[in-house]
């Protein structure tokens, strides 16, 4: 067998493997965000070219604004189209990796908690960081468009996680990351309440309906 024929065989077998695994996964759920651009304090906050080059998202929404009561918001929404490394790229953006690089110190983290919004159950993990004596509460959700049994939020971007995702066919599916940072909340509980209210305003759901 020639080298070219061997490469074609390997590539074909790989593609068949991905398709066979994906066909067993649940039907997709689709959602996006719509931020309050009519807020007078709304400001776009583009990712740096270095960050975009590393993460390579297909869609980026990043902005900040201030609400009545002086709650300051920063939201980053990233989306990756289906592809062989979508899951790995999505896992590269987490608060544990990004916030310390901006001078923030991690003070506490909380287990995954589901927040219901527009008919979608979004799994968020909460973090409390501090910089210059001021706390900031960060909530992180990583969403697989065709999720497996386990919740993916907070998975580490290690080779083991990559291989696990490949084995179940999950890594080829579309991926989304939603990170919400809140400054001005008295504590984690107050920040969670503010997050729940804000999600109802900014989440847009377009979940696929089963075909009959």
Stretch-by-stretch model annotation:
Residues 1-15:
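Hydrophobic membrane-insertion alpha-helices, especially the h-region
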Residues 17-38:
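Alpha-helical transmembrane signal-anchor/signal-peptide segments
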Residues 34-47, 183-188:
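Generic structural signal for short, solvent-exposed loop/turn connectors between secondary structure elements
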Residues 35-37, 68, 171-173:
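A generic structural signal for short, non-catalytic loop/turn and secondary-structure boundary residues
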Residues 41-169:
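Short, solvent-exposed recognition patches
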Residues 174-212:
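Surface-exposed amphipathic alpha-helical segments
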């Amino acid at each position: 067998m020639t080298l070219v024929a061997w490469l074609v065989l390997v590539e074909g077998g790989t593609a068949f493997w991905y398709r066979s695994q994906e066909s067993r996964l649940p039907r997709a759920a689709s959602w996006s965000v719509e931020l309050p651009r009519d807020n007078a304090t709304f400001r776009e906050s583009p990712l740096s070219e270095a960050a975009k080059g590393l993460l390579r998202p297909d869609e980026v929404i990043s902005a900040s604004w201030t609400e009545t009561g002086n709650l300051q918001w920063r939201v980053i929404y990233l989306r990756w189209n289906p592809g062989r490394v979508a899951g790995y790229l999505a896992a590269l953006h987490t608060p544990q990796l990004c916030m310390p690089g901006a001078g923030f110190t991690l003070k506490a983290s909380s287990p995954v908690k589901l927040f219901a919004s527009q008919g979608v159950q979004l799994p968020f993990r909460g973090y409390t960081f501090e910089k210059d004596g001021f706390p900031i509460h960060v909530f992180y959700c990583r969403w697989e468009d065709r999720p497996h049994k386990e919740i993916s939020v907070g998975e580490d971007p290690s080779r083991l996680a990559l291989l696990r995702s490949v084995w179940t066919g999950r890594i080829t599916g579309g991926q989304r990351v939603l990170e919400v940072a809140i400054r001005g909340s008295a504590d984690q509980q107050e920040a969670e309440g503010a997050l729940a209210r804000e999600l109802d305003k900014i989440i847009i759901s377009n979940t696929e309906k089963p075909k009959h």
